[in-house]
């Protein structure tokens, strides 16, 4: 299940885009919990890159299950670099925690990769502002550099300033949040008044179901042979995430280990 923002350690949804971080400031409103997962990035003969969820990773416990069957390893995918003894190393999965957000550049619902530094930054803001969730503030994230030198900075002062402006019912921020209801629906709260979810925001678990071993193996083989079909996203663990398959190499390379 999707984890709440405090506890994790680390509309129509027919087409859900992945948020692309460009150098500079990206501003988002988070509208879901965070879904823990690890993925393998595979490249087929046509040069296309696609993520396949690591079936050895337990989402709920946020840990790897030793000895669990893994079609990526069985099919013989390896790292490009050899180990210090000159031996081939089985391909390693990359952390790919995700959450639904509203991208303020176009006010569309998208999926954001919650990188380790972003997660820590958001949790720090929640602590500073005494928030149970980050749903009631916009988050500004600054990206610097590229590739393995990429850095992400969650701007705490901007979040504090936004929270103050949101208290004014006549502010642009308050009017934007009122308009967000058309996209995400009403907030659904628990008995303490804390937001659990938004009415129209789809379930991360249902959007990104964990495939069976057989389903994923077939999806990998189809992708590598260039014969993937419309069902392969679900079998790989990336239902409705076709746009992620076109993710650029830089975005893939700066994922967390």
Curated annotation (Swiss-Prot):
Annotated region (Disordered), positions in chain: 222-257
Record carries keyword DNA-binding: yes
Example GO molecular function: DNA binding
UniProt entry tagged with the keyword Acetylation: no
Biased composition (Basic and acidic residues): 225-235
Signal sequence region: none
GO BP field: DNA replication; viral DNA genome replication
Induction summary: Expressed in the early phase of the viral replicative cycle.
Function: Required during DNA replication. Displaced viral DNA strands are transiently coated with the ssDNA-binding protein. It is then probably removed by the replisome that performs lagging strand synthesis or during the events that lead up to the recombination process.
Protein name: Probable ssDNA-binding protein
Highest classification ranks of the organism: Viruses, Duplodnaviria, Heunggongvirae, Uroviricota, Caudoviricetes
